[in-house]
């Protein structure tokens, strides 16, 4: 029989090297797509409920802040849900740093949003800065319809496999 220390030594010898070149940096929404469970707890029906809750939290934040008084949820099909409110709408003007519409920044960049300080919302629910971008990352298709500043904006985002 083999001793424990020599067995452990054999395992160690068989392992390949582990160096800085093995360290990955995931960007954009890639971390969510690779490890959805880290963000929504899994990939089962409860995870889908979590995604719905993230969108609903945004509508409820508008209600609690006094900017909306109506939220509608519609089950369109087994895997499609519509959530709407009469709140302010996601900003669509260009973000000062990224030079693209703020809605695009919010939908495609983790840790972006208007809830980190108390300037926009005194209280808020959900995963601040990751909620709606996680929903986008894990949705086959996500359509935003935003009525803001007397204009109507529509943007459809689709899951693309490269």
Regions found by a protein language model. Give the residues of each.
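Single conserved hydrophobic/aromatic residue that forms the stacking wall/gate
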Residues: 1-12, 160-161
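N-terminal amphipathic, basic-rich helices that act as targeting or association modules
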Residues: 19-26, 47
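Conserved short strand/loop->alpha-helix "switch" segment adjacent to the catalytic nucleotide/phosphoryl-transfer site
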Residues: 34-52
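Flexible ATP-lid and adjacent glycine-rich G1/G2 motifs of the Bergerat
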Residues: 40, 88-147
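Conserved ATP-binding N-box helix of the HATPase_c
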Residues: 46-67, 131-136
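A conserved short beta-strand within the histidine kinase catalytic ATPase domain
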Residues: 69-75
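Short beta-strand-loop-beta element adjacent to the nucleotide/active-site pocket used for signaling
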Residues: 76-82
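Acidic ATP/Mg2+-coordinating residue in the GHKL
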Residues: 85
